[in-house]
A protein has these predicted regions:
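Conserved catalytic cores of very large enzyme subunits
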Residues: 1-101, 122, 126-284
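Contiguous, well-ordered alpha-helical segments that form the cores/surfaces of helical PPI scaffolds
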Residues: 105-118, 138
């Protein structure tokens, strides 16, 4: 899965470093759509936490059921995964459970920013919003740690990409609750813990905000920033941004840069309907729209 990170393996074989990443991965995700829970709680913060805690436990049960289903499959269902060491630890006499037990069952989330707007009328670009955001993320982290110990399986907090879910979840939300300012007045929910794309923050400010939450995830997250196309010619500035993200302990960082090409004259830059050089409308526009 995109942005996968593997934490310590509770089922590491004797003599194998539990922090080993090779041959492991996230097995299955369940994503909790938090704005819906905030609405069900009527905007009451403590009620929201009660509902969220219940949903996290339900997510665990769903993942355990999926895990057992996967373990019941024949190695032939994905022969290349087990017989060439792509998934490490496979022992034919024990079945594919011997390999899958080293993977991670992940609990993801969608719409932190919108959830905070429902609960307190602010998102995590504010001090009050960040305080509540950290409390929410701590609950995910604590529960996954408890599940890992109790079930002797790797559970982790995952900041879901939600490429399609962010749209389908919003459509269902609007059908039920209508359009709410700063919550459902867009066509999508904000992915996981990201700063909403309409917020006017600099790349470094975005890193500052999201870096306060990435440590709560031990199964995968990403922080990315969008820059103007001219930055491609300023490697020193790009390096400064990357170094800043690393200094903030961002585990997975990406930079989005618009890239438009005229297919007639070959001019490359950032432009819209037509090439500013030759006027051709035969252009290719590339944008990274997820992350």
């Amino acid at each position: 899965m995109c942005r996968t990170v593997n934490g310590a393996d509770i089922n590491a074989e004797p003599g194998v470093n539990p922090q080993t990443k090779d041959g492991r991965g996230n097995l299955a995700p369940v994503t909790i759509i938090m704005p819906t829970l905030a609405m069900e709680a009527g905007g009451d913060i403590e009620k929201f936490f009660e509902i969220l805690d219940q949903k996290i436990h339900e997510a665990k049960e769903m993942l355990l059921e999926r895990y057992e289903f996967m373990c019941a499959q024949s190695p032939d269902s994905a022969k290349f995964m087990y017989e060439n060491g792509t998934m490490s630890g496979y022992k034919p006499e024990e079945g594919i459970r011997s390999a899958l037990k080293h993977g991670t069952l992940v609990i993801g989330q969608l719409g932190l920013a919108e959830t905070l707007q429902i609960l307190i009328g602010k998102d995590h670009t504010t001090k009050e919003g960040m305080e509540l955001a950290k409390r929410i993320e701590q609950l995910f982290k604590d529960r996954c740690a408890e599940f890992k110990k109790a079930e002797h399986l790797n559970f982790g907090v995952y900041y879901t990409p939600a490429e399609n879910l962010c749209y389908t979840a919003m459509k269902k939300f609007k059908d039920k609750y209508g359009e709410i300012e700063n919550v459902s007045d867009k066509d999508f929910f904000t992915n996981s813990i990201h700063v909403p794309v309409w917020k006017k923050v600099s790349p470094l400010e975005k890193i500052d905000i999201e870096s306060q939450l990435t440590s709560y995830s031990n199964a995968g997250c990403i922080t990315y920033v969008e820059l103007e196309s001219t930055c491609k010619n300023n490697l020193e500035a790009l390096e400064q941004i990357v170094n800043y993200a690393m200094d903030k302990d961002i585990p997975y960082f990406a930079i989005n840069v618009p890239n438009d090409t005229c297919l007639e004259c070959g001019y490359t830059d950032e432009f819209n309907d037509k090439c500013p050089i030759c006027g051709s409308e035969h252009i290719q526009q590339l944008r990274r729209v997820t992350g």
